[in-house]
A protein has these predicted regions:
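Active-site-adjacent beta->alpha loops and helix N-cap segments on the catalytic face
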Residues: 68-69, 95-107, 126-132, 152-176, ...
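Active-site pocket-lining/capping segments in soluble small-molecule metabolic enzymes
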Residues: 163-189, 237-291, 296, 326-336
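Glycine-rich, positively charged N-terminal anion/phosphate-binding segment
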Residues: 44-46, 69-77, 82, 94-114
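N-terminal amphipathic alpha-helix/helix-capping segment at the start of soluble metabolic enzymes
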Residues: 40-58, 65, 174-175, 332-336
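Active-site mouth loops of central-metabolism enzymes
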Residues: 56-71, 117-128, 185-201, 278-292
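Short, acidic/polar
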Residues: 67-79, 101, 127-134, 198-208, ...
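Conserved, mostly hydrophobic/aromatic
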Residues: 59, 87, 137, 209, ...
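Active-site beta-loop-alpha junctions enriched in small/polar residues
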Residues: 60-63, 90-94, 119-125, 150-151, ...
Length: 336
């Protein structure tokens, strides 16, 4: 067990203030919140974490069935050894998976003692329904939201807002900031959003998110750090002064990366492209290559002074564990 892991209460055990003393004193201001069932939890906004440290964070997604929830929580539990400053949970595309998003978010807060950033999108819900989701999150002591428009339905290239719903992430941001006290993040795209006509127009939309209350930004995946560094430079020149956290997706297999980069509009550098071809039929070797590639990528980002790193873990712990073992970042490695 690492020193940082001792800051968390035992997985699945009731809240114990003594076990949280170190965590509570580490960063201020932290708010003690009473939630359903007479439980008390400690919460804080991620923007306050960013004022004190350079956070490492992990992103999870809800399973398709309720039976998959324990496996997601177990993966989260295993990664606590690396002392994540927060985790995020993506928003289900609809129906029951949305309730699974809330369930994982609440369980991470209650039983794992990890700060959580809940994803919320404009897809498939009216303003009133989204408001009700926000009220439930607030009642459970969740302090942080990442506000997203959401993707068009599979097979469609155009986003069509739900009747009575929000059309843009900025609309959702404005609603959250006007009605709640959440800390709010927004997404940004170092290589430009797939629907933007050019990088300057894309940056204008990012600036609107910040102007409407985004405390910090988290990037879409990228595999060439030059795109990130260029984006940050352009953002600063454009008056965007909030923290910009790079999002990193380690390669798990060749087909996965090619599929994700097509969907996101991210480019595959020639050197990585050759490696993906080399290991196209060997997932284990591709995964090991991905660990080394991401280790080098994150090391360069960290050494450049990024405010933190957000890992897209895809509900798997192996790759990100090895990456962090390689990097041994201060406060984010297991004891030998």
């Amino acid at each position: 067990m690492s020193l940082c892991e001792r800051r968390y209460r035992p997985f699945g055990q009731p809240f114990d203030t003594k076990l949280n003393t170190v965590l509570t004193d580490r960063i201020t201001p932290r708010r003690r919140v009473k939630i359903a069932g007479s439980h008390w939890i400690y919460s804080l906004k991620i923007i306050d974490i960013l004022k004190e440290t350079r956070p490492i964070s992990f992103e999870f997604f809800p399973p398709r069935t309720a039976e998959g929830i324990p496996a997601v929580l177990e993966t989260l539990h295993g990664l606590r050894a690396y002392c994540p400053d927060f985790v995020s949970v993506t928003y289900g595309a609809g129906g029951s998976t949305r309730s699974f998003t809330e369930e994982i978010t609440f369980q991470a807060k209650r039983t794992a003692g990890v700060e959580v950033m809940a994803h919320l999108t404009c897809v498939g819900q009216t303003k009133e329904e989204i408001h009700e989701v926000l009220e439930r999150l607030e009642a459970e002591g969740v302090e942080n939201i990442i506000a997203l428009r959401g993707d068009p339905p599979r097979g469609s290239t155009e986003f069509v807002p739900t009747p009575g719903g929000f059309q843009h992430a900025t609309d959702l941001l404005r609603h959250i900031k006007s009605n709640f006290k959440f800390g709010v993040a927004a997404a940004c795209y170092p290589e430009g959003h797939t629907e933007s006509v050019d990088l300057d127009t894309d940056l204008k939309y990012v600036k609107q998110k910040v102007d409407n209350g985004a405390d910090f930004l988290v990037t879409q995946l990228f595999y060439d750090n030059r795109y990130f560094f260029d984006f940050v430079e352009r953002a600063r020149a454009g008056g965007i002064d909030v923290p910009i956290i790079p999002g990193v997706l380690p390669v798990l297999n060749s087909s996965q990366v090619r599929r994700f980069t097509v969907l996101s509009g991210s480019k595959i550098p020639p050197a990585l492209d050759r490696l993906l071809d080399k290991y196209a039929d060997n997932d284990d070797s591709a995964r090991d290559m991905g660990v080394e590639y991401a280790t080098d990528q994150v090391r360069e980002l960290w050494d450049s002074g990024v405010p933190g790193v957000h890992f897209y873990v895809l509900n798997r712990s192996y790759s990100v564990s090895r990456i962090l073992d390689n990097l041994r970042l201060p406060g984010h490695h297991r004891e030998d």
